[in-house]
């Protein structure tokens, strides 16, 4: 499993940082802001939805998620990346934000992105490292399946059909 990166902002308890746990398993690699480069970056401030069409970007450059605190989300608003995408709405399964729309842990966001671009096995492998992880797929199975087969132009309509 290669091509999964994270930008660690040191905003949370390091013991709860999901991407750091994945790094300990050799499933993700930390990068600094200069190391982001052309990687496909997940950010809630992107104008463009992630879709299956982005699989080629993942394959070529990798995927980078921002590991930070939702309580300090405004601190990343000013960060701009060359290739940035946002996830469509999904429900969190992590114990801190269970059932909240869009308040995903970094591993949930990473797994959702991988699922949407067609890397289901990798998404499951990442989530399996957390006791609550696979529940994320169960909780979001229908929207994830629809997002993963849709063109970018259809994502907003699918999101609205599930989450209003």
From Swiss-Prot:
Keywords: Cytoplasm, Ribosome biogenesis, rRNA processing, S-adenosyl-L-methionine, Transferase. GO terms for biological process: enzyme-directed rRNA pseudouridine synthesis. The keyword Flavoprotein does not apply. Its main location: cytoplasm. S-adenosyl-L-methionine binds at residues 18, 66, 87, 106. Its EC number is 2.5.1.157. GO terms for molecular function: 18S rRNA aminocarboxypropyltransferase activity; S-adenosyl-L-methionine binding. GO terms for cellular component: cytoplasm. Belongs to the TDD superfamily. TSR3 family. Aminocarboxypropyltransferase that catalyzes the aminocarboxypropyl transfer on pseudouridine corresponding to position 914 in M.jannaschii 16S rRNA. It constitutes the last step in biosynthesis of the hypermodified N1-methyl-N3-(3-amino-3-carboxypropyl) pseudouridine (m1acp3-Psi). This is 16S rRNA aminocarboxypropyltransferase. It comes from Thermoplasma volcanium (strain ATCC 51530 / DSM 4299 / JCM 9571 / NBRC 15438 / GSS1).
């Amino acid at each position: 499993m290669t091509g999964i990166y994270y930008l660690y902002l040191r905003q949370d308890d390091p013991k709860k940082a999901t991407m750091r746990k994945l790094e300990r398993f050799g499933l993700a690699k930390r990068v600094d802001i200069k190391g982001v480069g052309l990687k496909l970056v997940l950010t809630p401030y992107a104008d463009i939805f992630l879709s299956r069409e982005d699989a080629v970007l993942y394959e070529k450059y990798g995927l980078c998620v921002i590991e930070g605190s939702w309580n300090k989300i405004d601190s990343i608003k000013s960060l701009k990346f060359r290739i940035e995408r946002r996830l469509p709405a999904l429900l969190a399964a992590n114990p801190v934000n269970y059932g909240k729309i869009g308040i995903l842990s970094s591993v949930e966001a990473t797994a959702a992105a991988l699922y949407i671009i067609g890397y289901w096995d990798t998404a499951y492998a990442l989530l399996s490292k957390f006791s609550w992880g696979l529940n994320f797929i169960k909780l979001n199975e229908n929207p994830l399946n629809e997002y993963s087969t849709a063109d970018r132009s259809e994502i907003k309509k699918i999101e609205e059909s599930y989450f209003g």
